[in-house]
């Protein structure tokens, strides 16, 4: 964990107040001698006590080390694979070949020299470019020099860059995984997990700690008539790494505290995590999408048209510039959206910019995502969306000209931090007469 996160407010106020003066107005939940809840002799309860959790674990490798600058090997998409940096020819296949070569080599830097690279989904592919192996870094020469230009506008539920591991959601128990019950309630933040047995688990394993969203759980939150399943999923769930095992006491020690209570009543239990990829980086480039050819139409862009086949909104709904799924200990830095010169409207992306899903311990820093073409309903015009993501750090990042800037969605989203972020021009729409919204800088759930 990085203790610097815990003193941000004091550091910011230091120019105006002494420490003693700052403490005169600080929260009673964060006194000068504050200690993490899980380290206290009598840890507080999520149900009965007010507390500030320790969010300093968010980010690449718990923010305990800096994001690496990977030296190589280098896979130059122009010199080695024939990509066209003028933007005249489609470079999807050459860039993907370089990505695949880096993956086969066990990792490396796929380098895009200064220039514009035209890409698009090939055939029925769900993304223009795809990274599916650990250790691959996609690096440009800087966001003002390297431009990835997606020239396809029929991008419904597609991505320009997709980073993902084969597999399924966190609630899926991997074949052959050991399973054990948590033998007593965990009412507050905890790193010591008492279980029925530790057989099959080892230090270093990534695990899932979870409890069902039972009817009793829903009623406990006065949400019995509201939580019909949307956003609830399998219930409270945490992805953690085992750092130690005590076989004598059947106790697992995990790397990051739990962020909500887990009760035996709700079948609290532990199993292994499915496959994820690690050490993937996206660095130093800009990314943009061609606008829809019917952007000037006064119909087909309404708030609900995303679900109406044949409309223009239907063509672009659910598209993302970048998507990261089942990814761990990875990063995005120095990445921006941009307006391709072919666009007559000042639009950078068709709908959404960045989605992080079922991923843990990622850092997004020094990025700028903005200007969606379509800002209708159903999950469009989100600049940074974290869905079932945990311990994600979004740092020094600006979002704007969107329906919603930062979005945390679904119950399995927890431990996430926005540090020195800025959201601006919320509810903006590029299309005259198109869907718009008063929107919000932050949308959906707060982070546990």
Segments the model singles out, each with a brief description of its role:
Residues 111, 118, 130, 137-139, ...:
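Extracellular beta-strand solenoid repeats
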Residues 107, 121-123, 143, 149-152, ...:
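Short glycine/acidic-rich loop motifs that flank beta-strands on beta-rich extracellular proteins
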Residues 1-5:
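Positively charged n-region of N-terminal signal peptides that target proteins for export
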Residues 280-379, 384:
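Alpha-solenoid helical-repeat scaffolds
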Residues 14-310:
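Extracellular "leader-to-stem" segments immediately downstream of a signal peptide or signal-anchor
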Residues 6-16:
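Bacterial N-terminal signal peptides
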Residues 131, 200, 235, 275, ...:
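Active-site-proximal structural scaffolding
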Residues 135, 144, 278-289, 328-341, ...:
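Right-handed parallel beta-helix
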